[in-house]
Amino acid sequence: MTKLTARQKADLMEELTGLKRFSVSLTGDSHDADDLLQLTIERVLEKGMPADAHAGKWSYRVCRNLWLDELRARDVRTRHAKAEMAGNGDLGVSTADGLSRLEFERASSALSVLPEEQRSVLLLVAVEGHSYAEVAGILDIPIGTVMSRVARARRSLADKLA
């Protein structure tokens, strides 16, 4: 990979607003979104991108991959914490915790319950306004996969909101 060209830097700057919306959509939290956006820009500036890469597509892909890395890390930390609590004889989750979790799930938007793959694709198409072909390029997946994920996401949302 090479450092960014002047054109790629300009394109990246043009994508900041969309990247911010995408980050908020992925994280569901403005603080996490700010952190994710900062990490994305840092990574793109530090690591660069192929000379022929489109800055927008590349930056969305970097953003999504960083978020997936964060989700994996959180999962590992959560499992580790639960294992430690179980080792100390603590049951781990009380009834109050369970009720709070249920209330939280009810309050969450229908988007947040979608699988990450479906949510990312749907957000890029519906919120960011990218075409299926553009999303396929951003996420480096076949266009048919984009189409099926969008369809499944829409069906899931319809079921959830019915």
Q: What is each PLM-predicted segment?
A:
Residues 31, 133, 144:
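Residues within helix-turn-helix
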Residues 1-21, 25, 31-34, 50:
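A short, charge-rich alpha-helical start-of-domain segment used by transcription regulators
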Residues 50, 62-82, 100:
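Arg/Lys-rich amphipathic alpha helix in sigma70-family domain 2
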Residues 101, 111-119:
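Short helix-coil-helix linker/hinge
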Residues 77-109, 131:
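Internal acidic/polar
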Residues 139-162:
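DNA-recognition helix of helix-turn-helix
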Residues 35-42, 46, 53-65:
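Structural recognition of an alpha-helix C-terminal capping motif at a helix-to-coil junction
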Residues 121-125:
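A short pre-motif secondary-structure segment
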